[in-house]
Curated annotation (Swiss-Prot):
UniProt organism field: Meyerozyma guilliermondii (strain ATCC 6260 / CBS 566 / DSM 6381 / JCM 1539 / NBRC 10279 / NRRL Y-324)
CDD domains associated with the record: EH (cd00052)
Domain EF-hand per the UniProt entry, residue ranges: 40-75
PANTHER family hit by this protein: ACTIN CYTOSKELETON-REGULATORY COMPLEX PROTEIN END3 (PTHR11216:SF74), EH DOMAIN (PTHR11216)
Protein name (record): Actin cytoskeleton-regulatory complex protein END3
Gene Ontology biological-process annotations: actin filament organization; ascospore wall assembly; endocytosis; endosomal transport; reticulophagy
Primary localization class, coarse: membrane
Length: 379
């Protein structure tokens, strides 16, 4: 079945806007006339609503509305004979893939990633583990890890421990203690999130543990510095790389394959529809405003921290120069006849340095004001 085309998304947007959404969402009462105009039975309409309302808030945002409209048109046009039991991967918005994953986990009762393993089972497994841990990540494994990373990273490229819980549930040979140990290994600073490099190594450790290798007690020196960064990196200009789909080796199940199938990123599934491809529409404006708000928050935080640090440093330096100038002036009063020329030269030099410092401070204040004005214009 084809993905949603850009022209189709724009058509749905016109209908969506015509229903006058509030806070970019449509209530059931506003969507009901459109659904009933399809002349589909009530039970099918109820099922379509259930599939479309992914976050179960009783309203449909634009992405959810697109899902409902496509399901209706497919049945009315004969492309589908009935409402599917679950949303196909190509129709799941990337922004809501994690909700689909969570809903399926709850529906199947798999909401514990330790798989009901006992401590005795874990101890027996530990005795059978080998110590020949291999830090090398093959291209195939890296592609799989990147697919998992792309499915769970936030807008800053960071990944939370809880966001991978669906993956943990598929690891039948990895106890929760080993998962926690692997996380702590790549996250020595105990941040709430980890970056891409840390995530890939974390997944590699889980993969090795799933295949009978003991979780190591440390990481190579080449990785230690990377994992010990003092602050997370929020590089918004870095794009998510496009990776090729991994292939399974031999006949055994590839690491993360069942998990990727759940979130619609498996090699057997089509890629989900990109609802962001709506240039020139109000929906694009809404989406860009959200991104702008996030950028403004980050910029304001950075500006405040930078301004406070610069002001403090300049204030201390200025005070030191003023004290030095005062000391030299007192020396001049006490010993007016000794080295008078040298003292005057020192005073003039210090006064010049103070003036330069004040000018530098004024320039930085002007730059800060200009930055505040640019932020105000973007709002």
């Amino acid at each position: 079945m084809p993905q949603l085309e850009e022209w189709e998304i724009k058509k749905y947007w016109e209908i969506f806007q015509g229903l006058k959404p509030q806070d970019n969402k449509l209530s059931g009462s506003k969507v009901s006339p459109v659904l009933k105009n399809s002349q589909l039975p009530q039970d099918k309409l109820s099922k379509i609503w259930e599939l479309s309302d992914i976050d179960s808030d009783g309203n449909l945002d634009f992405e959810e509305f697109c899902i409902a409209m496509r399901l209706i048109f497919d049945i009315v046009n004969g492309s589908q004979s009935d409402v599917p039991a679950e949303l196909p991967g190509w129709l799941i918005p990337a922004s809501k893939a994690y909700l689909i994953q969570a809903n399926r986990a709850v529906a199947t009762g798999n909401n514990q990633y330790d798989g009901g393993r006992s401590s005795n089972d874990d101890e027996e497994d530990e005795e059978l583990l080998s110590d020949d841990f291999d830090w090398y990540i093959s291209p195939t494994d890296k592609a799989t890890y990147e697919s998992i990373y792309n499915s769970n990273s936030d807008s800053y490229g960071r990944v939370r421990f809880q966001s991978l819980e669906g993956l943990y549930q598929t690891l039948t040979k990895v106890p929760k203690e080993s998962i926690s140990s692997a996380w702590n290994l790549v996250n020595p600073k105990s941040f709430e999130t980890i970056d891409k490099d840390q995530t890939l190594v974390f997944l590699h450790i889980l993969n090795q543990r799933e295949n009978g290798k003991r979780v190591p007690h440390g990481v190579p020196a080449s990785l230690r510095a990377t994992f010990s960064k003092e602050t997370p990196s929020y590089d918004l200009s870095e794009s998510v790389p496009q990776v090729s789909s991994p292939t399974s080796a031999n006949n055994k199940k590839a690491f993360g394959e069942s998990y990727l199938q759940k979130v619609g990123r498996s090699t057997t599934n089509e890629r989900g529809t990109d609802f962001s491809a709506t240039e020139g529409t109000d929906w694009e404006e809404v989406r860009l405003r959200r991104e702008l708000a996030n950028l403004e928050d980050l910029l304001n935080k950075t500006s405040k921290e930078s301004s406070t640090t610069q002001t403090n440093e300049l204030g201390v330096t200025k005070h030191e120069y003023e004290q030095l100038l005062k000391y030299k002036e007192e020396q001049l009063k006490v010993k007016p006849d000794k080295n008078l020329t040298d003292v005057k030269n020192d005073i003039e030099l210090i006064e010049g340095q103070v003036r330069e410092l004040e000018q530098y401070y004024a320039r930085k204040q002007a730059e800060l004001q200009q930055l505040d004005q640019e932020i105000a214009q973007l709002s």
